[in-house]
């Protein structure tokens, strides 16, 4: 069966592993998934990310992060722009997630950026997902 939205599948796997309190998650790799995983690591939503090369497309290993009492660092992930309904944002209209407590992941001409980085670089693009 052909997967129509691999980004939504990646976010759903993270959400499900987070709900089940798993420590490690492995998903098939792609460039955009690597970019999203790197942003999640840089913003402190996950502990670590490893990129494993194999003879196929590779694997991304995501180490999920929890608080001292087991509380989830990632409250929710929401896919915004979907294959059936693309959502674009001009540089002036870049959304803030929970008044800056969360992040928006945006695909721009500069690559994958958070909403803060896109505002600093003054670029707009496709709003991939919200994370809070």
Curated annotation (Swiss-Prot):
RNA-binding: present as a keyword of the record? yes
Q: Per its UniProt record, what InterPro entries does this chain match?
A: Ribosomal_uS8 (IPR000630), Ribosomal_uS8_CS (IPR047863), Ribosomal_uS8_sf (IPR035987)
User: What GO terms describe the biological role, i.e. biological process, of this protein?
Assistant: translation
Q: Does the keyword Iron-sulfur apply?
A: no
Pfam families from the xrefs?
Ribosomal_S8
Q: Which domain of life is it from?
A: Bacteria
Extract one GO molecular function annotation from the record. Answer: rRNA binding
What stretches pass through the bilayer? none
Q: Which GO terms describe its cellular component?
A: ribonucleoprotein complex; ribosome
Per UniProt, the keywords (alphabetical) are: Ribonucleoprotein, Ribosomal protein, RNA-binding, rRNA-binding
Similarity section: Belongs to the universal ribosomal protein uS8 family.
Subunit and interaction comment: Part of the 30S ribosomal subunit. Contacts proteins S5 and S12.
What does the UniProt function comment say about this protein? One of the primary rRNA binding proteins, it binds directly to 16S rRNA central domain where it helps coordinate assembly of the platform of the 30S subunit.
Name the UniProt record assigns to this protein: Small ribosomal subunit protein uS8
